[in-house]
Amino acid sequence: GIVGHVNLLIGAEKTKSVLKSHLKEGGDLFKGIRHAGGWDHHYELSNSHHNPPKNLYSNETFLESLNELSNMNLSFEAWQYHHQVNQVRKIAETLPNLKIVLNHFSGPIGIGPYATKKEEIFEVWKTDILKLSKYENVYAKLGGMAMPINGYEFHKQASPTTSDQLIQAQEHYY
């Protein structure tokens, strides 16, 4: 299916209108939207590709727009950083009929100030993901853990990363 995008900060009514347009064009293939919320206060890190404001996933306008997705039985693909998992949990709790797809393992950061804290990050991530897993409206899409921000430096290799290399580096996340 097709996963599109709507800037959910435009408000519920405008979101509903844009979603109707997506449905008109995509028909049954249109399944929902993705809105990245990855934000971090460290200057050496980039925020996710939508350059979201801090606490996007708890913004009232954003949540009202998410409710429109839920009302239309469309999914919300969330991508945020490891320290924002609880924001997704609050969405799952607030909007229990909204189908939420967690992208990229919730973005464990492994560069900059987080480069030396990978084990600590994993333990917090594991606890937060376990809490999130209690919500039946949350699904996980595996992948996206080989990005430079994850700190594995696969992009610096001369040849493509193998499955064995991925498993060796990331097996505890699976």
Regions found by a protein language model. Name each.
Residues M72, L95-P96, Y135-E136:
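Helix C-cap/helix->beta junction micro-motif
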Residues G1-Q84, K90-E93, S106, E120-I121, ...:
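Active-site gating/metal-coordination segments in enzymes
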Residues T94-N97, H104-Y114:
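Long amphipathic alpha-helical scaffold regions
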Residues I100-H104, K141-G144:
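Short acidic/histidine-rich active-site segments
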Residues K14-T15, V88-R89, P113, Y152-E153:
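A short acidic (Asp/Glu
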Residues I109-Y174:
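H/E-rich (His + Asp/Glu) clusters that bind or coordinate divalent metals
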Residues L29, L98-K99, Y139:
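Secondary-structure boundary/capping positions in well-ordered alpha/beta enzyme cores
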